[in-house]
From Swiss-Prot:
Protein name: Protein argonaute
Location of the Piwi domain: 436-760
Effect of a null allele: Inhibited cell growth due to inhibition of translation initiation. A change from single to multiple VSP expression in individual parasites.
Gene3D superfamilies: 3.40.50.2300, paz domain, Ribonuclease H-like superfamily/Ribonuclease H
One Pfam entry name: Piwi
Known role: Plays an essential role in growth and, with Dicer, also involved in microRNA (miRNA)-mediated translational repression. The RNA interference pathway is implicated in antigenic variation having a role in regulation of variant-specific surface protein (VSP)-coding gene expression. Several VSP genes are transcribed but only transcripts encoding the VSP to be expressed accumulate. Antisense RNAs corresponding to the silenced VSP genes are detected.
Annotated keywords: Cytoplasm, Developmental protein, Differentiation, RNA-binding, RNA-mediated gene silencing, Translation regulation
Source organism (scientific name): Giardia intestinalis
Matching SMART domains: Piwi
Subunit structure: Interacts with miR2. Highly specific binding to the mRNA m7G-cap. May be a component of the RNA-induced silencing complex (RISC), a sequence-specific, multicomponent nuclease that destroys or silences messenger RNAs homologous to the silencing trigger.
Gene: Ago
Major localisation: cytoplasm
UniProt-listed PROSITE patterns: PAZ, PIWI
Residues in PAZ domain copies: 110-194
Amino acid sequence: MRNNIAGPPITPVQATVKVTRVRQMDPTDLMSMKILLNILLRRTFESSLGMLNIRSGFYDLRNPSIHAIQIDGRGYDICWIPGFRLTTATLRGKLGLQILPETTKVRSKSMNELLTERRGNIHPSALAVITVMAMHNGKVFRVHSIVQGQTIVSPLANGNETDYFTYYSTRYRDKIDSAGLSLLRHNDYCNSVMQQDKFILKLTPLKRTQNGKVVRPCNVPSSLCIIISDNEIAPYGVSKLSTNRAAVALSTMSPDALLEKATAFAARLAEDTELQSLLGDYGFGFTSNPLELETFVCKPPKLMMDNTSRIVTIEDDSGGVFHNLLQSPGVSPIYYSNNNQPATGMPVWAIMVPRNLGNDYARRLRKELTERVRSLAGTTAPNIGDPPLIAVELSNQRREMYRVEPYKDAFKALLNKLRLEYKDARESEIVAKIQLVVIVIPGPKQDRGDLYKGIKQFYTHMGIVTQCLLAPKSSQNELQWYDQAVLRSVCQQIYAKAGGAVWAPVLPPQNVYSKSTMLCALDISRPKKTVGRPAEVPISTAGFISTYDGSFEYIYSQKKTLVPNRLNHGGELQQQTLMEAFIKNSCNVYLAFNNRILPDHIVIFRDGVSDSQISATLEVEIKSLYECLRQIYHKSNRPMCDLKVIVAQKTCAMRFSAVGGTVLRSGYYVINRSPDNRQQGSEFLMASQAIVHGTTPKPIRYKIIFDSMEASVDNDSFNQLIELTNAMAYGYVNWPQAISLPHVLHMAHHLSKFCGEVLRNGDDLFESCAIFGLQYRPFFI
């Protein structure tokens, strides 16, 4: 086992590829595919104890490193050039690795200054990089970007922008600047890279700034690739995309359109006599027709989703490279309605839109929301009904616009519309049939606070889940439509609130906590101190979240209002009773969904507990909780479970410094190796980003304050517990927001804050029959 805080390794490291975070994206979108690949490479290389962040350069910069990576049980060599970083690329429809100069990480100098220092003099008005892709054993592609000495200038654009590019070939290595090849250090390594005489030539428009730096213009959407093979150059497609509108437009083009655009670009190059003369000296010629190569495909890989097995497979023309790595959103078979009976789908839901937004906006919103939610539902899409449109009569006066009464009147109109369909049903039965209501409210955010709270209070106390959506901004008497990422996030929340499983963590099956485990989280929301009222004690709200299935996708929520007590008389008894009630209800729910079998492992995450409060928490809450669980398991004739209580502390004053000028990988670090976790507590720290020069942003400190098994830090169970925490904190699929805490603790925070600040501490969820069904759905997000 490698030491966590030692310097960077220089020996080969065995690593396992594992997906830790994936977002829902369009399979045909090249930009989305690039985002997916970046996510795969950012956090997928794990060693035995932590993350192996290849992108941040966690290697010896003086020597080349070759690391064996296991992908689906097959080994591949990933070659890394010192001073370069790994990114992603696609070739022949497969996933690949791309290496680009890591100048910003290696030293704080511009590309121009670095190359001038490394290579001597460069072209006075040009700077370029070549991307070389080579196939290894027919499976994995290694892509290298090498700065070369020969720079060819082709004035193809007007103004200050000029296309600069270079090329490389093993046949003419002696004609290339030897200083550029010195970056590779070893000729044997260079020969192993250039096994095939097929290369990608990347042409990037560059321009020189006033201070002499050469940069890529912001308005350049992409770089077009050209294939060099058998002394011919042919178009390939889009190589690099940025986030501007022109690039996004290119990313949505069909493969035929991309190939046509690349062909036109190659035709422009073929007409340049100066360029042909320069390349002719090296034996290369131009052709405007695509090469007849079956292995080169101008299209991205496809994401194939299996709704039954809940697995996404990345396929290509030759059968695929990465299989069974991603979990799809899937379909939720169970959620509870008010009559305590399981239901499937979302047959009854509605959309409320202010009338002043117009009919065109309302119809387009209904169409897009319905199509996106049905795409998430998979095979159960027919169970997603067509939502009726309900007009909300809002006043044009700004003061009257943010009143909740028009939305209450719109709900009455919805009930009247549903009475025509359910003529013999009572009003309470009709209300129970409504799964969700999408409500469009006027902006801006700073003005809609009371309206939002009023809507949530009105609908939640009736047991109806709502999804609020801000009205779009108007520009030149036209409404600006929503960003696609916003609509995608809204639809995922709608599907989750209806009972679907959208956010799933990725945990290896060999981890002991992947089976028969119940995760719990407790968070207490305390409102801001009341100014000018020192005698008042603010009311606090406790939110408790527990999981009841093996994949940790479905949650059961509980809420309790803590009685204010200035002298804390009976406060310890209140906390003790609170935890016992929470855990009893959670165990009953777990029994109902798991064939009357209790979990073998229970992991409880706590937030808001400082070091000075740990001893009191152990004496007051944990001991009584442990005895309560022993009684529950004794009645069920089951052995006592493995109980662990972990405190997450967001305010962490620890600092890490990079060792020897290197970069510490992101992941987790074991701080305290205590053999007795119940008495002293083992600690580990998680950081979401690599530690470069000193500190890391917002590290989370985890302290195991209770462990019924008393596992030491060297035990496999402890390492698997860290892996579980890491998966819950960073491994959730499709979560639209940033997560730094474990997901159950994140949800408990949302629950306590929503009930305390929005619902204003109304009826407790597990004491109110009217909103019993909401406990199984994340209505509070």
